[in-house]
């Protein structure tokens, strides 16, 4: 079967941001079902430090995470001055060492643990990328094996993970979180924190002083460390997509993982741009700390003992934090972060149950005030943050959110949980209100506002609209892609054509398709409300098939995510591709299967004429552009009208052109081109006349002439006017 294609003309704008942000406020809770680690954005509800740290006066947390350890001596030498400076603050030395291998009985490790350090997981052998060689089992084994090894250290329980090379390549993947992090090791162990996503502070955050986000040379202070343009000796980061922007807060990935986003730059990113131990790196780290304190977030610093940063620079950063902010800044190791989240935020609960499964905790903004709240089924507790008072308010939680879908079913923007068997729980006026409802015909689905009316629909095999008056779901006639269940893990919802409505990318082990949401009705084109515009669809074996989003089987998540107007894939089969990822831009997706431009020679060959006739090529780009009419003059000049301004003008102004061409060597090909007249309003006709030319450019018929001999018109007269403009194609 060959893929089915529909032609589509579209203009794609520049990248509109890091991640896809749904237009409808009713979709503010879809992150709970999003497997991507890159969904937070600048305006996403935040979990500020006072909400979870459990210590009065502390406004920001700093973690110091040093990577790559496989022997103790080198790390002791590098860290010792840093540890001693930390001890001067409160007697502790809270540093986390992201470790590959270490002897569990190494005596140095016990010294560190007593001082306040923790030993965390960095895989057994540091593969870059982790997913490679077409061997998922290799990746899982080096992660879980590292966790089991470090658990043999007396007094050490590893809780955190950092992905090797996460600061220099696309080694991080949704496949890792869904199929490795969220599982348990052979020893039944699991982790609680990842710290591999990088947060870029940008000048788009208008709450920050300009000097914090722009350096003395006028460059973006933090974006510059991810260079986009190739330069000798510099690794370009043009396709590096392991980032979020302006969100220095912990967040939850795929329900079971706390993400502590890393600060840009790491010491590797700094040396890549400005060399080893450059003073500018320390200056920018200090500004990152300033930002963290102002935003009441976390600064998670990535560094190594490889000479990219010096010990003294780390000591100076600690010294700056202590002297500038005092007790407002708290240094913690990752075990302390996990403990404080569970004690002070979750009241003794956890994202994961004793066996590593989903404990039902949901971190979400219940009242749409911009701050995260929590529901904790093990404690039957709802906790809502009172930002003005700076404290939590609590109320009972009368249901278990596991198996339920969250969304907005009320114009008040209140959060609801929907039980597809016949109950809706809505949080309003600080309590949960229970509503018995008539279930939809589809019992499996998710809540998502697809028509942007501010109320979520129930998406299953069909689209079901909420009827609040009768407390029921009504099946709509909106078009759904054939044989596609809208809760399928092989679907990604994203606005491909920037019309404000979510479109569908679908790809599983047998089928794939690209479907645009359509509001218009056009029976001839097959357009009906819903996902009726089929850009392309086909079978897995089709040439050019969209890579799988879900591959089925035991480990289905295939590592797809949306970022910067692209869909990306990172898995064990992409490691040999450029930047270790597969990718499709939105422009490519919308042009899927469309005809590609032909060379002038190939275009000539494509013509078919009757016997006795032939087609000769006399002019092509770049001598002409967007030609719509031509005529010869008695002097042999070829006059051409160009409508490059169709259909909306150029920057809103007329941009049509008339030019003349000459065949200087008499070979039949017009190689010299001169612009005669510009700024015409959609010209569609030209005729040599007298000493000049006649041009039809509605509403006018114009006579233009060159009287100076420079080849350009200096006389322009309107001979007739008043012609109806209408559609340029219908003149």
Regions found by a protein language model. Give the residues of each.
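Active-site-adjacent pocket scaffolds in enzyme catalytic domains
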Residues: 19-41, 48-50, 156-159, 163-294
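C-terminal domain-boundary segment and adjacent tail
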Residues: 36-39, 44-47, 54, 88-90, ...
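Beta-propeller blade termini
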Residues: 359-366, 405-418, 443-450, 489-496, ...
